[in-house]
């Protein structure tokens, strides 16, 4: 397996809407394995394909981080949502920054699994928040799009400095 490069905000591909997956095959499953490897390497609990520069509707999640409850959502769609909640969210594409984001407390999601079969998942708490965060990525939305323009600009400046440091280190 491989650890993939994670795009850093404000990379323009993070703002693009992803295309649905047409075929679930061995190549996609290898990519999903690489997404999990990348997510664990960066100590994340969720990762969306556009974060690794693949504009497809694929999400990997493991809120426990122990590799026993891995969730794959291909072409996810929120069917129902209720309640209000929110936590300070972070993002692998915006390292070191967090912000309070309003989210729905409970969700029902329909998606394809790794075998290409349709399933529904009921989620609440942190899992529901994570699913919403990752689906936002598929729609070209980042958590900074939910906060004030001033805070967003400060984070953007911080990330541009970080990107320059990373480039110099290569």
UniProtKB/Swiss-Prot annotation:
EC number(s): the record gives: 3.5.1.88
Cofactor binding description: Binds 1 Fe(2+) ion.
Q: Where is the signal peptide?
A: none
Q: Which GO terms describe its molecular function?
A: metal ion binding; peptide deformylase activity
Entry keyword annotation includes Iron-sulfur: no
Q: Which Gene3D superfamilies match?
A: Peptide deformylase
Binding-site list for Fe cation: 91, 133, 137
Q: One of this protein's GO BP terms? A: translation
Q: Which residues form the active site?
A: 134
The source's domain of life comes to Bacteria
- Indicate the enzyme's highest-level EC class: hydrolase
> Which cofactors, if any, are listed as required?
Fe(2+)
Keyword annotations of the record? Hydrolase, Iron, Metal-binding, Protein biosynthesis
Q: What is the recorded function of this protein according to its Swiss-Prot or TrEMBL entry?
A: Removes the formyl group from the N-terminal Met of newly synthesized proteins. Requires at least a dipeptide for an efficient rate of reaction. N-terminal L-methionine is a prerequisite for activity but the enzyme has broad specificity at other positions.
The family line of this record is: Belongs to the polypeptide deformylase family.
Descriptive protein name: Peptide deformylase
